Amino acid sequence: METITKKARSLYIPYAGPVLLEFPLLNKGSAFSVEERRNFNLSGLLPEVVESIEEQAERAWLQYQGFKTEIDKHIYLRNIQDTNETLFYRLVQNHLEEMMPVIYTPTVGAACERFSEIYRRARGVFISYPNRHNMDDILQNVPNHNIKVIVVTDGERILGLGDQGIGGMGIPIGKLSLYTACGGISPAYTLPVVLDVGTNNQQLLNDPLYMGWRHPRITDDEYYAFVDEFIQAVKQRWPDILLQFEDFAQKNAMPLLTRYRDEICSFNDDIQGTAAVTVGTLIAASRAAGSQLSEQKIVFLGAGSAGCGIAEQIIAQTQREGLSEDAARQNVFMVDRFGLLTDRMPNLLPFQAKLVQKCDNLQHWDTENDVLSLLDVVRNVKPDILIGVSGQTGLFTEEIIREMHKHCPRPIVMPLSNPTSRVEATPQDIIAWTEGNALVATGSPFSPVIWKDKIYPIAQCNNAYIFPGIGLGVIASGASRITDEMLMSASETLAKHSPLVNNGEGLVLPALKDIQVVSRAIAFAVGKMAQQQGVAVKTSAEALQQAIDDNFWKPEYRDYRRTSI
């Protein structure tokens, strides 16, 4: 499949008849013209009327509205995706705000949990550990030769739901749907992959419908050797691929990123994408308040790879704003289930050890507890920003939020855990506990809050603001790596598109209807930074913009011409 440019050329294809109708990337359904029906042996296989894609999308929208539950809507949309991808993306594009929570978080969580139950049709690649020696052959079975973006998971830490085995495939499928819907990357360029290394979820192992390898998860050297076989096979098949690691467990996520980020063009969205969108949100929120991020004190609940990744990017940004590294680190406080991370805490992971507070600096704190709880930290630090990445519901209690508000007139509270069932506090409660003074951004979508007859829109700190633009920028520029500076440029660009900053009112993040505009801007910034960093060939700004335009796929049908195989 070629990328659609401004003037879509005719596409020459060898398929015909029922085979063509079964090819999701090429199928037009009732939109095949009279001439195409004749040339491709489709006469009589479709109803008489030739429809436009908008007419098809209107019918699909009416059918969609007939489903009452979010999971049924998800299944319906996935069925369209698996039969006619162009129609799927036109429908999603027409109703993005309505459908994004259905094709991705929070509904995708339920789809992952019920993957084997609701399975309809194969999509993507499943590589099981018993098949590890056939890795090259498996990737050769992928019919699309021009794959440019892979999202891969091993299913061990799916959202806040834990080990879902091969059910985790729902995440790469959903993520790549957003690469296309938000970032304009052709679906012909994308490939979802799940590494089936077993599961420790006993419920799945006991489920007679479970479709994955029924075996406890492999670990340690066996696990890392298997992942390495996969990476090497991908490099052999698609040397210029962009590989996104998704929903790997904390113990593996950072080691894999560290090992491969300089070997293959790759990033971890849970660590780097979440950090980029969070930092972009915080830059915008700080500017809207007339200050800088470097002036804020920040407390985290959750010191896993995602939380620590956000913290490190905040530290990098505040250094850019003029702080020394030591001063920047003193403004960030990490709390996990064992309390505040300090230099006397044993058994910390390497990425956590860099974010400890020195106990000598805490001697003046007003507390009698040996373990410094979140409430102790909030009471003594008096933070401006509170970020939740714990994956545990209800941990931002009324006492904690009111204590924060006591010392901060306009607190920024970001319960980012997904899905909505795992959020640290609901926006409704946070707004009420702060008398309507908090700026709230969440990880999953929430409806606006009505408090004392005033409406408070809730920004969704969604990685979809970031990763589609990064992907488009990498493809357009031909970047060979994703650097920290490229991620920072994405954060800065997102902040520049904040309605709250630009207009003095509204959401801190752009409306979802504007996400393609934001993705294009991020793609340009990322591509330009890649050139400056020497990981992409330097071109003029005009040439880079043209490459972005040329690679931005639109859900429009093209004219088909018949060719022989």
Swiss-Prot record:
CDD domains for this protein: NAD_bind_1_malic_enz
Q: What is its EC number?
A: 1.1.1.38
| Pfam families noted in UniProt | malic, Malic_M
Q: Which cofactor does it need?
A: Mg(2+); Mn(2+)
Q: Record-annotated residues binding NAD(+)?
A: R157, D270, N418
HAMAP family given in the database record: NAD_malic_enz (MF_01619)
> Can you name one GO molecular function term for this protein?
NAD binding
Active-site residues annotated for this sequence: Y104 (proton donor), K175 (proton acceptor)
| An example Gene Ontology CC term for this record | cytosol
A GO BP entry is: malate metabolic process
Looking up SUPFAM superfamilies in the UniProt record yields: Aminoacid dehydrogenase-like, N-terminal domain (SSF53223), NAD(P)-binding Rossmann-fold domains (SSF51735)
Site (Important for activity) location in chain? D270
Tell me the residue numbers annotated for binding a divalent metal cation: E246, D247, D270
Q: Which family does the similarity line name? A: Belongs to the malic enzymes family.
Q: Which UniProt keywords apply?
A: Metal-binding, NAD, Oxidoreductase
Q: How does it assemble?
A: Homotetramer.
Cofactor: binding comment: Divalent metal cations. Prefers magnesium or manganese.
Listed name of the protein: NAD-dependent malic enzyme
Instruction: Name the source organism.
Output: Salmonella dublin (strain CT_02021853)
Q: Which reaction does it catalyse?
A: (S)-malate + NAD(+) = pyruvate + CO2 + NADH; oxaloacetate + H(+) = pyruvate + CO2
